[in-house]
A protein has these predicted regions:
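A short, structured loop/turn motif at beta-sheet edges
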Residues: 12-16, 65-70, 90-100, 145
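Short beta-strand segments that buttress and anchor functional surface loops
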Residues: 48-55, 74-80
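Hydrophobic pocket/interface hotspot
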Residues: 17-22, 28, 64, 75, ...
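Helix-adjacent hinge/juxtasegments
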Residues: 60-67, 71-83
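Beta-strand/loop substructures that line and gate deep hydrophobic ligand-binding cavities in soluble
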Residues: 79-134, 141, 150-152
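Short, surface-exposed coil-to-beta transition loops
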Residues: 4-6, 57-62, 83-88
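Hydrophobic ligand-binding cavity/cleft-lining segments
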Residues: 1-43, 160-161
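Charge-rich (especially acidic), low-complexity segments
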Residues: 149-161
């Protein structure tokens, strides 16, 4: 059992503008407040894969397995040879849009149900919500300002700063 964590943001931009930035190779370099670097491994019609290095040096690999042009995508993220978490990015709306990110974090999911529930409730969920809200604010900030988001723009994060 893996409990999801989900956050979304309303954007005063149409879905095409939002899709253009979230589907751009290396876009985390411009939009992600905790990204040190986002390097592309593959980025073509059928294959999308990149590497995200956080400000604190953690390196995670993102492998996109579902690409729904103009609407969103699904990917697995994790250390190169480690367990992966599932992430779903979804755009809804037309002239004004909503960007939603849902993460199914693998961390501590191998614990018994009670331990996992407690860890998820008091550690994973609040930490991931803070992280996801900062990431979403980064996209909004980039779309409004058309400049790269300053690092830790919305506050530091104990897992990634």
């Amino acid at each position: 059992m893996i409990l999801p964590v989900s956050c979304s943001i309303d954007l005063d931009f149409d879905n095409k503008q939002v899709w253009q930035i979230i589907s751009e190779p290396g876009n985390l370099n411009k939009t992600h407040p905790f990204c040190k670097s986002n390097s592309v491994v593959k980025w073509d019609k059928d294959n999308h894969e990149d590497i995200l290095e956080y400000l604190n040096g953690i390196v995670l690999h993102r492998n996109f397995y579902k690409w729904d042009e103009g609407k969103g995508y699904e990917l697995n993220i994790g250390r190169k040879k480690g367990r992966k978490s599932k992430v779903i990015w979804k755009i809804t709306g037309d002239e004004k849009s909503n960007l939603n990110i849902t993460v199914y974090p693998h961390v501590f999911s191998d614990r018994n149900k009670l331990s996992y529930f407690l860890i998820h409730t008091f550690f994973i969920n609040p930490g991931l919500k803070k992280y996801l809200n900062s990431v979403l604010k980064g996209y909004k900030w980039y779309l409004e300002n058309r400049r790269s988001v300053p690092r830790n723009q919305f506050g530091r994060h104990k897992w990634f700063s």
